[in-house]
Design a protein with these regions (language model features):
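A short alpha-helical element within helix-turn-helix/winged-helix DNA-binding domains
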Residues: 30-37
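Key DNA-contact positions within bacterial/archaeal DNA-binding proteins
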Residues: 41
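Beta-hairpin "wing" of winged helix-turn-helix
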Residues: 55-63, 67-68
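Conserved segment of winged-helix/HTH DNA-binding domains
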Residues: 73-97, 117
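C-terminal regulatory/oligomerization modules of transcriptional regulators
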Residues: 96-148
């Protein structure tokens, strides 16, 4: 599976915002851009899609920015990727439908539909909160000193 940069950057930006979800702080596109090293113009496109999907709330003005529309535990990776990667969840094209419809039928029922369902289930089970927890855990582990 190949996730576009829009999906990868959007997921990274949402994790970054979720890490500040306990505060009422608004996060600007500039802040995300600087912290993650992503183009501001590209992030504006990503946030536009996230806002349209009602995953973030935007506040305009000098003190404006973005914050999550829901708690991180109520938002899944599926929600985010579905907003940013609509082609990821499209039906697979037929490959041999005209000459071998029985093969195509088996492929669709046993492989493509099953694979889609497994991926969607895993993405729905993976919450933004669980990703933030993993980032926090990773930070703790990287700060440990090991002596021999």
């Amino acid at each position: 599976m190949r996730i576009s940069s829009k999906g990868r950057y959007g997921l990274s930006a949402m994790i970054f915002i979720a890490m500040t979800a306990n505060t009422d702080e608004l996060i600007t596109v500039n802040c995300v851009s600087e912290k993650l090293g992503i183009s501001k113009i590209y992030l504006e496109q990503v946030f536009s899609l996230l806002k349209r999907a009602k995953l973030v709330i935007s506040i305009k003005g000098a003190q404006g920015g973005y914050q999550l529309a829901r708690k991180p535990e109520d938002m899944s990776c599926y929600d985010i990727l579905h907003a940013l990667e609509q082609s990821l969840f499209e039906q697979t094209d037929s490959s041999v439908d005209e000459r071998a419809p029985e093969i195509e039928k088996v492929l669709k029922a046993s492989v493509w539909t099953h694979l889609d369902n497994v991926i969607i289930k895993e993405l729905k089970d993976l919450t933004l909160k669980s990703l933030v927890d993993k980032v926090d855990s990773s930070k703790l582990n990287s700060n440990l000193m090991y002596y021999i």
